[in-house]
Amino acid sequence: MKHIVKHIHFVGIGGAGMSGIAEVLVNLGYEVSGSDLSRNAVTDRLAALGARIAIGHDAANIEGANAVVVSTAVRSDNPEVLAARHQRVPIVQRAVMLAELMRLKQGIAIAGTHGKTTTTSLVASVLAAGGLDPTFVIGGRLISAGANARLGTGDFIVAEADESDASFLNLYPVIEVITNIDADHMDTYGHDFARLKQAFIEFTQRLPFYGSAVVCVDDPNVRQIIPFISKPVVRYGLSADAQVRAENIDARDGRMHFTVIREGRSPLAVVLNLPGLHNVQNALAAIAIATDLGVSDDAIQLALAEFNGVGRRFQRYGEVPSADGGQYTLIDDYGHHPVEMAATIAAARGAFPGRRLVLAFQPHRYTRTRDCFDDFVNVLSTVDALVLTEVYAAGEAAIATANGDALSRALRTVGKVDPVFVATVDDVPDALAKVARNGDVVITMGAGSIGGVPAKIVQNTQQKG
């Protein structure tokens, strides 16, 4: 590619999926430019690495580009897309550019409705501890690396494979992980769950004859597609028929202690520096891959025990003063689907037994809120106190029967929790200040703008102090 394409432009370069690819390309020596609607820490980092960043979208931004990279979130009437089309500059989907990177190395692609980012981070961390120095492209910031991407010198590239727009079918990795299959982004699949499962089967058909599919057999939908996978399969999970299995699981002090059982290997005692059974499953995927690639047990144990997590995945902000003179524990999480939320709430209950759990939740997308409405009501009813915001639209038109007010009314009808409804995330810090008490565990959750709330709370605390 490099002898033809010198300058690559990204429309929406600050996004989680785009920025990692851009960073790897910068480090490979390409001229990289990009635009986004606002400046953030990601765009600042890319600029410091040498990328040319423009705030706002304008036709002039693509000047000199040999290719323009877009995601499915970029509208066809974007001025940079229109300019590229007019100038006959190739417009490349994000997943296609990721596929080009995978051609340079041996790809390890992590797919699944939930857990992709954490699992990708765990795989990258364990392989790095084993001396394989992988390249990685992650949908969140790997805290130990301070970035969501890195160009390694090793043979492997570890990346998320996105099923939300079916773009993972552009990838041709040598190892695939499927964490789970759940009903999300169903507009892509015509609201046909069978089509979604078929897409995952087709994903495994991208593997070479020497490749392998590493799949979580605890998920019933994953288990259903195994007979249709024609390539070698490695089963992981808590189930009795898993080839890489966790036993003797014990949650202590926010960590998961367990024993790994692998066919033909001695049992391996592991301490995972993350809470929750779902993270035990994510770690098992990393252990399965690392074992297959010859990473030592010592390196596996060290990487998991010292894993510092991923930004916005049960990210701890420490202790914050409460209005009653005590303090509460503040945590932030990206969860935005009821299944993810339930897993995070269960992890919090396990990590902080007996403590009151307060959730500040911003629903993400009206269509998801509509499609999963009853499930949202059920999972939100399991917390002890709730601050609820209006739905983060993500470009969608509002749906009156699936907005924050409708969700609040439904929760009050069920009667297990009385939500405090606020119109915007700017109101969340004040609302939490009134709700949170000494000893509480407070979680801010959602895939939208609520991610900026914890830092704002900490900043407010420092200013008062």
Curated annotation (Swiss-Prot):
Name recorded for this polypeptide: UDP-N-acetylmuramate--L-alanine ligase
Indicate which residues the UniProt annotation says bind ATP: G112, T113, H114, G115, K116, T117, T118
| UniProt feature coiled coil, ranges | none
Q: In which pathway does it act?
A: Cell wall biogenesis; peptidoglycan biosynthesis
HAMAP family given for it?
A: MurC
Database matches in Gene3D superfamilies: Mur ligase, C-terminal domain (3.90.190.20), Mur-like, catalytic domain (3.40.1190.10), NAD(P)-binding Rossmann-like Domain (3.40.50.720)
Q: Which NCBIfam families match?
A: murC
Recorded catalytic reaction(s): these are: UDP-N-acetyl-alpha-D-muramate + L-alanine + ATP = UDP-N-acetyl-alpha-D-muramoyl-L-alanine + ADP + phosphate + H(+)
GO MF annotations, alphabetized: ATP binding; UDP-N-acetylmuramate-L-alanine ligase activity
Keyword ATP-binding among UniProt keywords: yes
Traced from the root, the source organism's taxonomic lineage reads: Bacteria, Pseudomonadati, Pseudomonadota, Betaproteobacteria, Burkholderiales
| Primary residence | cytoplasm
